């Protein structure tokens, strides 16, 4: 009888990918990146092991928001003090902190547990076209071919 293959943490080979976010819709980019971070693009996917690859996203400031999301989509967070509810729109994030906009979108698509937080650490977002990971020799991914 055959058993299902279960990957062990020592057997996993992690790759580095670089994705250009210029003129790519935020949600479509986020779903592809979340899938790569989880490792669901690998045939040996095991849900309880961090199998995901490292992803570098450049040009985050030029990501596209469709419809009226720039003004209508609101992100909330609370400071745990009375009256501490803060709200920022997606357009505000894109203008002042585009890295945070992509991180919020992608982290929302990862599991809400310790494994999901660990997988989220493999995401590296940069507002411009420069990044600090040239030594890892990242492989370029064309997001339009994956969507």
UniProtKB/Swiss-Prot annotation:
Xref: InterPro entries: Ribosomal_uL13, Ribosomal_uL13_bac-type, Ribosomal_uL13_sf
A GO molecular function held by the record: structural constituent of ribosome
Keywords from the named record: Ribonucleoprotein, Ribosomal protein
An annotated GO BP: negative regulation of translation
Gene3D superfamilies: Ribosomal protein L13 (3.90.1180.10)
GO cellular component: cytosolic large ribosomal subunit
Family according to the record: Belongs to the universal ribosomal protein uL13 family.
Family matches, as HAMAP family: Ribosomal_uL13
Cited function: This protein is one of the early assembly proteins of the 50S ribosomal subunit, although it is not seen to bind rRNA by itself. It is important during the early stages of 50S assembly.
Subunit note: Part of the 50S ribosomal subunit.
Protein name: Large ribosomal subunit protein uL13
Organism: Leuconostoc mesenteroides subsp. mesenteroides (strain ATCC 8293 / DSM 20343 / BCRC 11652 / CCM 1803 / JCM 6124 / NCDO 523 / NBRC 100496 / NCIMB 8023 / NCTC 12954 / NRRL B-1118 / 37Y)
Taxonomic lineage: Bacteria, Bacillati, Bacillota, Bacilli, Lactobacillales
């Amino acid at each position: 009888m055959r058993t299902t293959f279960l990957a062990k943490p020592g057997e996993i080979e992690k790759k580095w990918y670089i994705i250009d976010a210029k003129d790519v819709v935020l949600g479509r980019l986020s779903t592809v990146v979340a899938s790569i971070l989880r490792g669901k693009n690998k045939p040996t996917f095991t849900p309880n092991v961090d199998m995901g690859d490292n992803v570098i996203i450049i040009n985050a400031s030029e990501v596209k928001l469709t419809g009226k999301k720039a003004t209508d989509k609101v992100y909330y967070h609370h400071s745990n003090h009375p009256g501490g509810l803060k709200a920022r729109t997606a357009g505000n994030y894109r203008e002042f902190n585009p890295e945070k906009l992509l991180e919020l979108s992608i982290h929302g698509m990862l599991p809400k547990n310790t494994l999901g937080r660990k997988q989220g650490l493999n995401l590296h977002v940069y507002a411009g076209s420069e990044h600090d990971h040239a030594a890892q020799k990242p492989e370029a991914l064309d997001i339009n071919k994956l969507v």
